[in-house]
Amino acid sequence: MHNEANNKQDNEIMRAAIVGSRDFNDYNMLVEYIYNICIENNYSITEIVSGGARGADKLGEQFANNYNLKLTVFKADWNKYGKRAGFVRNVDIIKNCDICFAFWDGESHGTKHDIDLCKDYNKKCYIKLFKNKG
C-alpha cells in the first residue's frame, strides 16, 4: 500500500496474498484490516497475489487496482487438475507471497487450505474471521 506505511523507513517490502471465502464481500473491512496490519508491522505491500475466484480474491484484485499495486493472479486449471485444481492453485499462491491475509467464514475448505499452507511454507498468515450478514 502506498500510504503512510510506505513513508516510514526500514519498511519490509512484501508480496501479499489476499485469499478467502467466496462469499466474502466487505471491501471496507478488507482495506481497514490490511491497512491496520501494515501500519502496526511497518509492512510495505508492493504486490497482491490472488487466485482469481469470486469473493475475497476479487476484492484483493480490486485492492491492487485501487492502490496501483502489481497484481499476480493464479487461476485454477480445472481441465488439467479436475477437482484438485483449487488446491494446486492455492500452493502457487502461497509459494509466491511473503504474507497472507485470509478472510475466512470458519467453514471454507479452500481458505483453510491456504491457512494450513502458510504454516507448511512458514509464511505469516493474518486471519480475519467474518460472519455473513443475513
Predicted regions and their residues:
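Glycine-rich beta-strand-to-loop/alpha-helix junction loops that act as flexible
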Residues: 19-21
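Acidic/glycine-enriched connector segments
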Residues: 4, 13, 23-134
